[in-house]
UniProtKB/Swiss-Prot annotation:
This is Peptidyl-tRNA hydrolase. GO terms for cellular component: cytoplasm. It catalyses: an N-acyl-L-alpha-aminoacyl-tRNA + H2O = an N-acyl-L-amino acid + a tRNA + H(+). It is an enzyme of class 3 (hydrolase). Hydrolyzes ribosome-free peptidyl-tRNAs (with 1 or more amino acids incorporated), which drop off the ribosome during protein synthesis, or as a result of ribosome stalling. Catalyzes the release of premature peptidyl moieties from peptidyl-tRNA molecules trapped in stalled 50S ribosomal subunits, and thus maintains levels of free tRNAs and 50S ribosomes. It comes from Streptococcus agalactiae serotype V (strain ATCC BAA-611 / 2603 V/R). The record marks N10 as: Discriminates between blocked and unblocked aminoacyl-tRNA. It is found in: Cytoplasm. The record marks D93 as: Stabilizes the basic form of H active site to accept a proton. Keywords: Cytoplasm, Hydrolase, RNA-binding, tRNA-binding. Belongs to the PTH family. CDD domains: PTH. Its EC number is 3.1.1.29. InterPro entries: Pept_tRNA_hydro (IPR001328), Pept_tRNA_hydro_CS (IPR018171), Pept_tRNA_hydro_sf (IPR036416).
Length: 191
């Protein structure tokens, strides 16, 4: 069986470590202890890495389409590698959750997230596994755009590193058990 773990974000160094790039950060954390090197594939508009875990080929994906067009890369890669939607997990930021909280879902609307809107539009379904990482709402007069494209406050940095470790543990648990439902029950709502 082949699986695909996708972290959403925006390409380019100016977006490194921004809240909107928590998906990229999570994928980078997951592969940190594996033998994975990313290569940019311009045909698929993504950085792609892979490894074998428990005898299964796992693709780690960071779309380079910019957030709002993430569905283009996701659909192309699922089709090319003949991966079922049920064997894919999308990791992304969520404004409506407190900073550092993680939530697992097997289906649902985009909730205003343009990357998820794009994936739903290109796949034609809302039924795919996902891990949402809370980035909180902007304070005061800050716009949503400035908030999601901003970096985490110093106070939140250690919490985010711990959260990324939890996402890593959860994805590894999923890859061991091959059971997203069980993973949800074990890790949902952690902070």
């Amino acid at each position: 069986m082949v699986k695909m773990i996708v972290g959403l974000g925006n390409p380019g160094s100016k977006y490194n470590d921004t809240k909107h790039n928590i998906g990229f950060m999570a994928v980078d954390r997951i592969v940190k202890d594996l033998d994975v090197n990313f290569t940019e594939d311009k045909n698929f508009k993504a950085e792609i890495g892979s490894d074998f875990i428990n005898g299964e080929k796992i693709y780690f994906i960071k779309p380079t389409t910019f957030m709002n067009n993430s569905g283009i890369a996701v659909k192309a890669l699922l089709t090319y590698y003949n991966i079922s939607i049920k064997d894919m997990i999308i990791i992304y930021d969520d404004l409506d959750m407190e900073v550092g909280k993680i939530r697992f879902r097997q289906k649902g609307s985009a909730g205003g997230h343009n990357g998820i809107k794009s994936i739903i539009a290109h796949l034609g379904t809302q039924e795919f596994d996902r891990i949402k990482v809370g980035i909180g709402r902007p304070n005061g007069r800050m716009t949503v755009i400035n908030h999601v494209l901003g970096k985490f406050d110093k106070n939140d940095e250690i919490m985010i590193l711990n959260t990324l470790d939890k996402v890593d543990n959860a994805v590894n648990y999923y890859l061991q058990t091959n059971d997203f439902q069980k993973t949800m029950q074990k890790y949902n709502g952690l902070k």
